[in-house]
Structure formats: structure tokens, C-alpha cells
Amino acid sequence: SGKDFKTGQTLVKSGFAPIIGTRCLGLSGWFSTNILGNRDGLVLDEPANFHTKEVSKLSTLETILKPDVQPDLYGHGNDEDTQYYHKVRINYYPPRNDNKEGWDNIDIFGWMGYPMQVKINFLCRDSILAAPLLLDLCLLSDLAARAGRYGTQRFLSFFLKSPMHDYTKGEEAVNNLYQQYTMLKNAIREMGGYEADEEID
């Protein structure tokens, strides 16, 4: 389980950040901005409302790239000079209505510190992306209840931001989209009476 549907830039981040991490590319900065004109955009135009969403978006990269494990690539500690710069913005723009556009500028570096950039421009319809997730969540929640599973359902984090986990059991948040997909497939197999056939790396 988690908070808020993962349909736009957080989906992009949870899918692209693992590429950076598995190739051991360094990250200097990631700048994300959105424009949208629906009610969501209007609500998030208020700074106090935006703050919660900003925190969930910012935490995605940290849990995937793990700066404490690879400080030379992703920074470490509280020293801003050694950390990658991460900025997220959402702008209300009424002419777009339900059409959402997200821009991501990603500054990376490779072998011998050579700088490179990745640009992603994601034009989408918020409700078209969210509606199937709602249906999947209803069906899978019902399946979990029928299978006698209660409490936090970590496998549903595939659809959601800010994945929930049990600190008391030593669990860590999983934001990596591919690991979340493995968790989803394994949970469905287990609820169907089969063994999980994939490990989460």
C-alpha cells in the first residue's frame, strides 16, 4: 500500500532511476516540473498542499539510488556539495485541463566524471492513467482479502507513491518500479497457491 497514485513523474523516476543505479552512473541533479490544469493542479498550486507531494517525490530517488551505499555517485551525509540536487515543481495552468505535461532534466556523469544529460518530456492525461490503477487496486485488494491477507499490502506499491512498510520487521521502502513489479507478480502467485518464482534484488 502507499499514498497517491503513481501515474506521472514519480512513475518515470521509479522506472528511470534504476537504470542510472544499475549502470553505476553518477547523478549531479534531477529537475522536474509539471504543468496541469485540472483540480489536482489547482490544489497543488497552494504551497502547503504541494509540500506533501514534494516530500514523496523527493524520497523516491533516495531509496532507489542509496547515497549511503555509493557516496561517490550519489552523495552522502548532510554536505550539500556532495549531494545531487533534486528539485520538483508543479504549476497550475488552466488551458491544459486534464492534460498533464512533465519535463525532467537529469544531469548524470559517467566514466572519468564525463557529464551527460537525459531529457524526458511526458505528455499524458491524468485521469486516463489513474482510472486503470483504481480498478486494479480494487480487484487486487479484494483478492488479498479473499486470500486472508490483511494489513499493509506491500505488493500494491507498484501502483502508489510513498510505499508503506513495517519498520518493526526491518522492512525498507521499495520505490524501484521493477522490484515493485516483482513483488506484485510474486504476491499474485502466492495468492493463487503457487510459490513466488522471482527474487527481489
Model-derived regions: residue spans:
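Conserved anion/nucleotide-ligand pocket segment
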Residues: G2, K6-E80
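Context-gated lysine
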Residues: K3-K6, K13, K53, K57, ...
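Glutamate identity and glutamate-enriched acidic tracts
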Residues: E46, E54, E62, E80, ...
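C-terminal and late-domain segments of enzyme folds
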Residues: L61-R149
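C-terminal active-site/capping subdomain that shapes the small-molecule cofactor and substrate pocket
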Residues: F109-D201
